[in-house]
């Protein structure tokens, strides 16, 4: 119900009308990521092309998004990496605080997927002259994985624990003097990469052996990497690496996207999910239903005008059956019937060409820290 529809009502009805509108506004947020993230741009697309009343909220990453969905008033949707589920399984089983274990358990029983979005590649970057060649070589190395709450931090810790049964040695995030970026996360990554290429520079506590980056390909930061860097290969060769396939899949980093690669390289991939929760409030569930309907009705707009990652969506009105999910996850019983009964429109959208590495500008800042060939 919008404000305009409240006009002409009696005072009593008018009060109820505006109260209903205020309640609707209170439930209309999606939490995504920082403003340079693809997650944030996906949220902006949903607001612009599907649901104008949607508020797109910034965050530090996947863990923060889940916390916001469970604890922040008004947040009805979030975008997260699929392996965030395992983080809360670990909390439920192992946290020493009973209140945290109970909260994690309630959260796991409430989280629901609206739709899988796209795969993100997981990159383990080292110096070109490093003896490390593949993922299994990172044991006991110093990892730069970004701040607590970020997707890279969560995923790196999860992968490391599954491989070696212990926590990694983590380099505390820092920002090197003179390093620029649109947000702190970008500055952290650039600073860690700079120290990776300049191992003799700066204080000891800022030295990293491996920098972990995650994103949907092509990742602009990687497109600019120069000859001082190399990517560790992901090879499935033992029970520990095979166990990773419960939460992840294997893909290939394309040498055409990343000129510093000598060839296509096998990498781990994690899915990104658009999620909601099992809400008790009827008005909030009505808003979730409205959101699913808007996604159905405006699919073509998202495909034609939105971020290129919308083209990776496996669900579509022409193929409305939702794909199977990774272990532990379930679809929302509110949104699934709406999406799976969605019918295609008569229009089609032309593909949008992705930017190529050669078309990306190379700033002085990038050149100064060893980026760009």
Predicted regions: what they are:
Residues 102-117, 257-266:
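A structural signal for short loop-to-beta-strand junctions that line the ligand-binding cleft
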Residues 17-21:
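N-terminal signal peptide c-region/cleavage motif recognized by signal peptidases
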Residues 42-48, 57-108, 189-203, 216-226:
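Pocket-flanking alpha-helical
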Residues 141-159, 248-321:
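Ligand-binding clefts/hinges and TM-proximal coupling segments of bilobed small-molecule sensing domains
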Residues 130, 165-284:
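Pocket-lining segment of extracytoplasmic ligand-binding domains
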Residues 27-50, 120-199, 317, 327:
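Bilobed "Venus flytrap"/periplasmic-binding protein-like clamshell domains
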Residues 1-11:
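Bacterial N-terminal signal peptides that target proteins for export
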Residues 190-194, 198, 205, 210-211, ...:
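An extracytoplasmic/periplasmic, membrane-proximal ligand-sensing/linker region
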């Amino acid at each position: 119900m919008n404000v305009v529809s409240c006009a002409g009502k009696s005072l009593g009805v008018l009060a109820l009308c505006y109260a209903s509108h205020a309640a609707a506004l209170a439930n209309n947020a999606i939490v995504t990521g920082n403003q340079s993230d693809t997650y944030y741009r996906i949220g902006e697309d949903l607001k612009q092309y599907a649901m104008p009343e949607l508020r797109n909220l910034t965050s530090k990453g996947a863990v923060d998004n889940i916390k916001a969905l469970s604890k922040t008033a008004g947040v009805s949707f979030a975008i997260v990496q699929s392996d965030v589920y395992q983080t809360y399984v670990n909390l439920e089983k192992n946290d020493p605080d009973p209140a945290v274990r109970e909260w994690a358990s309630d959260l796991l029983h409430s989280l629901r997927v609206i739709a899988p979005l796209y795969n993100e590649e997981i990159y383990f970057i080292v110096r070109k002259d490093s003896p490390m060649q593949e993922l299994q070589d990172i044991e006991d190395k110093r990892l730069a994985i970004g701040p607590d709450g970020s997707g890279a931090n969560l995923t790196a810790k999860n992968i490391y624990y599954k491989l070696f049964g212990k926590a990694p040695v983590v380099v505390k995030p820092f920002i090197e003097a003179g390093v620029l970026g649109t947000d702190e996360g970008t500055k952290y990554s650039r600073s860690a990469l700079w120290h990776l290429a300049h191992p003799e520079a700066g204080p000891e506590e800022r030295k990293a052996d491996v920098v972990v980056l995650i994103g949907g390909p092509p990742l602009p930061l990687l497109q600019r990497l120069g000859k001082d860097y190399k990517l560790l290969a992901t090879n499935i060769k033992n029970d520990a690496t095979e166990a990773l396939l419960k939460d992840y899949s294997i893909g290939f980093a394309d040498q055409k996207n990343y000129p510093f690669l000598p060839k296509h390289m096998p990498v781990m991939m994690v899915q990104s999910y658009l999620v909601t929760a099992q809400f008790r409030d009827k008005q909030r569930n009505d808003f979730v239903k409205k959101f699913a309907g808007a996604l159905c009705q405006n699919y073509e707009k998202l495909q034609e005008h939105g971020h290129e990652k919308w083209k990776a969506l496996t669900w579509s009105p022409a193929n409305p059956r939702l794909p199977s999910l990774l272990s532990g996850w379930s679809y929302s019983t509110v949104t699934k019937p709406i999406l799976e009964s969605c019918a295609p429109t008569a229009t089609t959208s032309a593909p949008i060409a992705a930017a190529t590495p050669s078309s990306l500008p190379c700033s002085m800042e990038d050149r100064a820290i060893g980026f760009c060939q």
